[in-house]
Amino acid sequence: MFPGTAASRAAEPRVGLPVELTDRPVLGANTATVVVVEISNFKCTQCRNFHENVFPTLRRDYIETGKVRWAVINASDDESEQYGKIFSLARCAHRQGKYWELLDGLFSVAHRAPSVLEALVAKSPLLDAGELEICLKDRSVRTAVAKDFEQAARLKIRGTPTFVISKWSADGTRTESTIAGAQSLEYFQRAFDALLKKP
């Protein structure tokens, strides 16, 4: 557990977060008093297992009920991986508003060769292939991916997945804790329930 930092306004719980939520995949109400920032790598087996076996229940019980807000930084502790096409593809899927719908597919093809990877994602009926092609050539996408890696580095992660959890109390004070690794559903449920009980 890390020392709490004061949020400037209790009514706006995103104030004081360790990373920016703008222009990244986010689910949940912005009034939630618990905000999770997940650092995830598409080539990480534990990350994939978490999203297949744990996240759906957390999404149903905590995110969709307005208790928890969930944001994702797609990165790793290896800076050289930022040049992998999978991260740009994820960014472009997000720009078309289809990140969450394509998440399982991105995990399943992440280890393929870049040219094959792009072709497979472009075939998705959820995406506009023309927009995807334009997006992948947009320098701002590469800049956004690099920024994701920079933010992950500032959080000093030592592996993926890592979950940075912020909790706001009624007086606007923020406390921060970290969960490392793809823990069980029960582990996350206990952690969230304990945080949500705090005033």
Identify what each model region corresponds to.
Residues 1-18, 178:
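N-terminal targeting signals for export/organelle localization
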Residues 17-34, 62:
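A short beta-strand-turn-helix
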Residues 21-22, 54-56, 150:
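Alpha-helical scaffolding within the catalytic cores
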Residues 32, 40-123, 195-198:
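Structural alpha/beta surface segment adjacent to cysteine/selenocysteine redox centers
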Residues 35-38, 69-72, 162-164, 178:
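Soluble periplasmic/extracytoplasmic beta-strand elements of cell-envelope proteins
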Residues 36, 44, 132:
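Residue-level signature of catalytic and energy-coupling elements of molecular machines
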Residues 37-42, 173:
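Acidic/histidine-rich, surface-exposed loop or edge segments in extracytoplasmic proteins
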Residues 119-199:
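C-terminal cap of thioredoxin/glutaredoxin-like
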